[in-house]
C-alpha cells in the first residue's frame, strides 16, 4: 500500500509550482548549458560540462521526488477542520512554563515544515506531543537543550 503524505493545500501548491519550474524552466536551461559546454570540445577536462551534468542529475532527482510526493499527497482541507483536540493542520498557541514565552505553531506535513515561519512537521517531537491534546493541557518535550514544558493556550484552524 502506498503511504499517503499529509499536506496542507498551500504546501501542495508549492510542490506543484516547484515541479513545474524544474520541468519547464530548469530542465531546458540545464540542457542548453550542457550543449554549450559540449561545444567547447574535450569533455574529460571540461568543468562547465561536468557542473552542468551534476546540476542535471540533481534536478532530475528532485523532479522524481516531487512527482512521488505529489502523487502520494493527501491534501487536507483545513477549512473543514474543527474541534478542541489538536491534529494535523491545527494552529497551536503555547506558553513555555519556565520562561513564560508564548509561541504559535501550525502542524504541517514534513515537506512544509519551516520553524522560522511557525510551521512544524507532524513528525517532530513537539507535534507528536501535541497531537490529541487540547487547551489547558500541558506537554513535555525533550529538546536538545533538555526537557521543555508547555501549556496549550489556544487551538485554531485554517
Curated annotation (Swiss-Prot):
<dbReference type="Pfam" id="PF03449">
    <property type="entry name" value="GreA_GreB_N"/>
</dbReference>
<dbReference type="Pfam" id="PF01272">
    <property type="entry name" value="GreA_GreB"/>
</dbReference>
<dbReference type="GO" id="GO:0032784">
    <property type="term" value="P:regulation of DNA-templated transcription elongation"/>
</dbReference>
<keyword id="KW-0804">Transcription</keyword>
<dbReference type="InterPro" id="IPR036953">
    <property type="entry name" value="GreA/GreB_C_sf"/>
</dbReference>
<dbReference type="InterPro" id="IPR018151">
    <property type="entry name" value="TF_GreA/GreB_CS"/>
</dbReference>
<dbReference type="InterPro" id="IPR028624">
    <property type="entry name" value="Tscrpt_elong_fac_GreA/B"/>
</dbReference>
<dbReference type="GO" id="GO:0070063">
    <property type="term" value="F:RNA polymerase binding"/>
</dbReference>
<keyword id="KW-0238">DNA-binding</keyword>
<dbReference type="InterPro" id="IPR001437">
    <property type="entry name" value="Tscrpt_elong_fac_GreA/B_C"/>
</dbReference>
<dbReference type="InterPro" id="IPR036805">
    <property type="entry name" value="Tscrpt_elong_fac_GreA/B_N_sf"/>
</dbReference>
<comment type="similarity">
    <text>Belongs to the GreA/GreB family.</text>
</comment>
<protein>
    <recommendedName>
        <fullName>Transcription elongation factor GreA</fullName>
    </recommendedName>
</protein>
<keyword id="KW-0805">Transcription regulation</keyword>
<dbReference type="InterPro" id="IPR023459">
    <property type="entry name" value="Tscrpt_elong_fac_GreA/B_fam"/>
</dbReference>
<dbReference type="GO" id="GO:0003677">
    <property type="term" value="F:DNA binding"/>
</dbReference>
<dbReference type="GO" id="GO:0006354">
    <property type="term" value="P:DNA-templated transcription elongation"/>
</dbReference>
<comment type="function">
    <text>Necessary for efficient RNA polymerase transcription elongation past template-encoded arresting sites. The arresting sites in DNA have the property of trapping a certain fraction of elongating RNA polymerases that pass through, resulting in locked ternary complexes. Cleavage of the nascent transcript by cleavage factors such as GreA or GreB allows the resumption of elongation from the new 3'terminus. GreA releases sequences of 2 to 3 nucleotides.</text>
</comment>
<dbReference type="InterPro" id="IPR022691">
    <property type="entry name" value="Tscrpt_elong_fac_GreA/B_N"/>
</dbReference>
<dbReference type="InterPro" id="IPR006359">
    <property type="entry name" value="Tscrpt_elong_fac_GreA"/>
</dbReference>
Amino acid at each position: 500500500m502506498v503511504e499517503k503524505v499529509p499536506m496542507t493545500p498551500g504546501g501542495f501548491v508549492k510542490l506543484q509550482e516547484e515541479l513545474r519550474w524544474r520541468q519547464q524552466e530548469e530542465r531546458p536551461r540545464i540542457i542548453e548549458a550542457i550543449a554549450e559546454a559540449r561545444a567547447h570540445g574535450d569533455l574529460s577536462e571540461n568543468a562547465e560540462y561536468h557542473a552542468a551534468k551534476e546540476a542535471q542529475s540533481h534536478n532530475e532527482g528532485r523532479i522524481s521526488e516531487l512527482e512521488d510526493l505529489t502523487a502520494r499527497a493527501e491534501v487536507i482541507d483545513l477549512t473543514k477542520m474543527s474541534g478542541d483536540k489538536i491534529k494535523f493542520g491545527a494552529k497551536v498557541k503555547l506558553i513555555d512554563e519556565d520562561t513564560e514565552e508564548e509561541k504559535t505553531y501550525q502542524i504541517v506535513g514534513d515537506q512544509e515544515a519551516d520553524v522560522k515561519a511557525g510551521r512544524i512537521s507532524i513528525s517532530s517531537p513537539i507535534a507528536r506531543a501535541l497531537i490529541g491534546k487540547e487547551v489547558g493541557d500541558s506537554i513535555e518535550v525533550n529538546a536538545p537543550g533538555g526537557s521543555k514544558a508547555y501549556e496549550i493556550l489556544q487551538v485554531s484552524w485554517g
